Amino acid sequence: QFLENQKSQREEIAFENGDLKIDYPSRTVYFQGKELHLMPIEYNLLCLLAHNVGRVLTHQYILDKVWTNAMESDLSSLRVYMTTLRKKIEKNSTQKYIQTHIGVGYKMIRVTDTKEDSNDEAGA
């Protein structure tokens, strides 16, 4: 369901947020230039958060969009996958990419890119 919508958005080839990059056509994720090996659910979670960067997504919304098997679609499974995803994308970084909103859900934080900041200051 989510992936079908993703494929229809051909104009989005890649997502970049700080050291994190998602290459949609190849379904590949890079962190600090190195390819990360994500399980399909982790990849789908990451893409959903990336498509909604800066917005809090409720637990139920995430479960409805990412899980196809109702048996595994529960809050404890979501927490486990979110923990493993965080470990992979925040492993060697002081930057946090995924923020927990206790009792509500999760959101991806837009990371400030120092290159863009210096360009903005130079142009001002």
Regions found by a protein language model. Name each.
Residues 28-81, 87-96, 102:
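Positively charged, aromatic-enriched patches within helix-turn-helix-type DNA-binding elements
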Residues 3, 101-103:
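Compositionally biased, intrinsically disordered low-complexity segments enriched
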Residues 16-43, 107-124:
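A structural micro-motif at secondary-structure boundaries
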Residues 13-15, 96-99:
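ABC ATPase A-loop
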Residues 1-16:
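Basic, amphipathic DNA-recognition helix from helix-turn-helix-like DNA-binding domains
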